C-alpha cells in the first residue's frame, strides 16, 4: 500500500465523499486532492514527515483559466497557501480539515 493510499484509508470514504474530494494525486510521500463546497479551501495536501507525522497544507485556487492550444484544452491555476500545519497525527486529520475548510468530515 502506498503512502497516498494509507492517507486515503485513514480519512475514509465518508470523509472524502463529504468533502466532494476529486482529482486525488499520489505524491509518493503523500496525497493531494481537490475539494468542493468550502469558501476557504480548494486543495488539501497531506505529506508524511520522517517523524511519522503529517504536514498538512491547505490551498485556495485564486484564478483558473482554460484555453485551447493546438486543440488540446489546458488549465492554468494560481494557488494561494491558506495554512500549513506541522506535526499532525493521523487521528487529528478530521478535526483539522473541518477547522480549516468549515466542512464536516463525518456523519
Spell out what each predicted region is.
Residues 62-107:
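Mixed-charge, Lys/Arg-enriched low-complexity segments
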Residues 32, 55-57, 78, 84:
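Ser/Thr- (and often Asn-) enriched beta-sheet segments in non-cytosolic proteins
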Residues 52-65:
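Short, surface-exposed beta-strand/strand-loop-strand elements in extracellular ectodomains
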Residues 47-51:
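Short beta-strand micro-motifs enriched in acidic
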Residues 1-38:
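Negatively charged, low-complexity tracts enriched in Asp/Glu with abundant Ser/Thr
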Amino acid at each position: 500500500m502506498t503512502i497516498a493510499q494509507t492517507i486515503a484509508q485513514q480519512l475514509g470514504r465518508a470523509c472524502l465523499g463529504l468533502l466532494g474530494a476529486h482529482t486525488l494525486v499520489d505524491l509518493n510521500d503523500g496525497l493531494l486532492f481537490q475539494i468542493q463546497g468550502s469558501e476557504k479551501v480548494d486543495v488539501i495536501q497531506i505529506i508524511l514527515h520522517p517523524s511519522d507525522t503529517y504536514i498538512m497544507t491547505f490551498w485556495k485556487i485564486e484564478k483558473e483559466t482554460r484555453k485551447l492550444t493546438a486543440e488540446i484544452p489546458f488549465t492554468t491555476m494560481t494557488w494561494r497557501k491558506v495554512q500549513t500545519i506541522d506535526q499532525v497525527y493521523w487521528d487529528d486529520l478530521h478535526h483539522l480539515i473541518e477547522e480549516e475548510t468549515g466542512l464536516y468530515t463525518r456523519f
